[in-house]
Amino acid sequence: MEDIGNNNFEIIDDKSDEKNDENFEDKNSRNNINEEQILSNQQQQQQQQQQQQQQQQQQQQQQQQQQQQQQEQQQFKNEVINTLHPKQPNNEYSLSSLSLSPQTPQINLSEKLISDNSNLNSNSNNNNKDIESGIQTKIKNIENRRNSINSDSSGTFNNEITNGRSNDNEIININNNVGVQVTFENICYKVLNKKYNEQKKIIKKLESGKIDIEDIESQVNKLPIDRIIEKELTILSNVSGIVEKGEMVALMGPSGSGKSTLLDILANRKSTGTITGKILVNGKEIGEAYKMFCSYVTQEEVFLETSTVYETLKFHADLRLPDMTDTEKDIRIKQVLKDVGLDRKLNSKIGGILPGGMIVKGLSGGEKKRVSIGCALVTNPSLLFLDEPTSGLDSLNSLKVMKVLLELTKMKGVTVVCSVHQPRPEIFYLFSNIMVVLKGRMVYSGSNILEYLSSIDSNYKCPPQMNPADFILDVCDEIVNNPSQYSTTVDTWEKYWKHEIQPTISNDPINIDIPKRVGFIYQYWVCQKRSYQSFVRNRVVFFSKIVIAILIGLLFSACFGTVGYDGLDQNEAQSVSALFFFIITSLNLLPYSSISTFVSIRTLFNSERASKIYHPFPYFIGSMLIEIVSSFFVVLIITTIIYCIVHLRWSFEAYILSLISFYMVFLASVFMVIAMSNIAGTVDLTFSYCTGVSVVLVLFSGFLVPINSLPDSFGWIHHIDYLFYGFSSIVIIQYRDFEFQCPQPPIPCLYSNGNNLIEFLGLKNWEYNKSIGILTIWIAFFYILAYIGLYKFNKEKR
């Protein structure tokens, strides 16, 4: 038993030793962990201390920078007082809380504006704070503008854009000689009120008792008679603003606010209404020379689809830069294409859908917009106006186009003004200045519109995740619906414009170099060359005319090919007369296939005429020459096929005279269709007009009803029917002194010769030369009418 107990005791001792060893190891491991934690804590403390030191250093640097900025601001404010507001005896203003020299009264501008505004608004205490905070914001805007001008004068431009803008640390040289400052003062625009005359007529009828009240009850809501309607509608009223050189300005406002109207007036593109006010370039009125400084890019891209990018710009360069050589024009065009990012698309076609339905592959929508910008930049303008440059483009192409415009302001010093509606935030922050037009009045112009709106009302703060453009339009809507707020906003801007902005108008000298106008002959040559290129490249339309001419010739030849094979008798003579009638009728209807072409070309012409690239007359002559030449080949094919198959009077003289008659008829029809398309302006109206005219022409052409059989009441109509003169000329050529074969008795011989048939048709006293002469007069008439329609009707009205 003792042995067993001793053994157990030994076992217990062994276990206790093992436990002691384990405890010792645990203690060591814990000690190691504690040491590691201590080391890591020490390292963290050291890092925190280093971070604190860095933060302190950054704070010190920021404080130093703020102090420097405050000093610079104070210096600038002193400069503003001395430069913009010179000392005057008893009337002098200061910016915000800045005072003048001790010798003069210290009048605060914000206090001056507040006192003026208190006469207009009973709630002056609240509005005064808003106005004063708005003035403070405007001071910041002037400081920013002054800083940008200082940076420009040093020949460098530092583009550091935040809040969605691109970062660009490159220093770019600016050509300040290109840019100009544009100021517009008290711009007013009025148009005639159509309802004024309507109301006047109704009131006159009511006074005379010729109309009852019950008859006009349906019109009372649309045309009130209880108040006098103004004779003119005011679209813009006393709009003033300033655009500095090298700025990219956004002209914003709700739909119908007048922003597009203001843009058209600034771009000298308004063709209707009454415009008053002044537009100054570097503080000077320069009259017609203003056109030399600006270019305009329309919302729609209208180009010739078959032209290349280079040819499109070359066309503008040839007509706008007459003093340049071809080599200089080539260099200018390639530089412009490089500026707009199209240097790799030099020989690419514009592309689009041709009038015949053929699709020409070409540029994308954004690239076409850049071509429009390139055409405007060919003349190296100082001002570039764009109407909705992002309209119809996706977000990516819109951003690309706007970045191109931004680069132009930096690289070339070009001043860019765009009318925009709701740009995306990335585009909004690209603009250096924002102008807001509301109900035909200017309510803001500056670089910090969001701060300005918040200064007007504390509720006008843009949420961080909201598009600033959407926010601005929402605020504009609220201001419009609040008459007192709208009146206060407009008055505040007008007072600020008068006292703060207007004195900063530049007086820099202007070097006006008005280029010579291109001569008519050169304009004709350039337009004719482009028309020829388009004609050659659009082969579908021309070949379709050729195919139709061949089919008409073969079809008529198949139907009348056996006539007169054994000699022409009186029955076959009537068939040949029917052949002549159908040929002339076909030649009258064949130009209808080109109506869509004529209308589409008219759209291009209107766009180019609005830009005053060329005079309409040389353009018209150049484009009509192509129609004259192509028409001859169509008539030549039809006449030759019929003369070779149908047994007509064969002689070279008869063939040539017949060809002339058919060609004159076809040419008159072509010019008639062109005249109708120029007057109507649309494909549908042109078809309607031409169809009505053709029915009358065919009916009185002299075949269906001989002119001797027409009643006296409307028998004169054949005298104004050019188809009649064509039909009479061809009948005289074929039948005069031509012997017919008489039938065997008892069938009477009605026409023993062609003279009898000519007499039956009432053409006894007609001569070939007389018919051709009158036909020539009709061709000249339609030619002149086509030009008048091009020149006077369906102009681009803006």
From Swiss-Prot:
User: Which keywords fit this entry according to its UniProt record?
Assistant: ATP-binding, Coiled coil, Membrane, Nucleotide-binding, Transmembrane, Transmembrane helix, Transport
What are the coiled-coil residue ranges? 34-83
Q: Where is the composition biased (Basic and acidic residues)?
A: 12-29
GO (cellular component) term, any one: membrane
Q: Which positions fall inside the ABC transmembrane type-2 domain?
A: 540-793
Q: Where is the ABC transporter domain?
A: 211-464
Disulphide bridges, residue numbers:
none
Chain positions recorded as ATP binding sites? 253-260
Q: Membrane-spanning residues where?
A: 540-560, 579-599, 628-648, 656-676, 687-707, 713-733, 771-791
Q: Which GO terms describe its biological process?
A: sorocarp development; transmembrane transport
Biased amino acid composition, Low complexity: 42-51
The way it spans or sits in the membrane comes to: Multi-pass membrane protein
**InterPro entries in the record:** AAA+_ATPase, ABC2_TM, ABC_transporter-like_ATP-bd, ABC_transporter-like_CS, ABCG_transporters, P-loop_NTPase
* Compositionally biased intervals (Polar residues): 30-41
Query: Where would you find this protein in the cell?
Result: Membrane
- Gene Ontology molecular function: ABC-type transporter activity; ATP binding; ATP hydrolysis activity; ATPase-coupled transmembrane transporter activity
Keyword hit for Metal-binding:
no
Which portions of the sequence form the region Disordered? Answer: 1-51
Report the main location listed first in the record.
membrane
**Family designation:** Belongs to the ABC transporter superfamily. ABCG family. Eye pigment precursor importer (TC 3.A.1.204) subfamily.
Q: How is this protein named in the record?
A: ABC transporter G family member 4
> From which source organism is this entry?
Dictyostelium discoideum (Social amoeba)
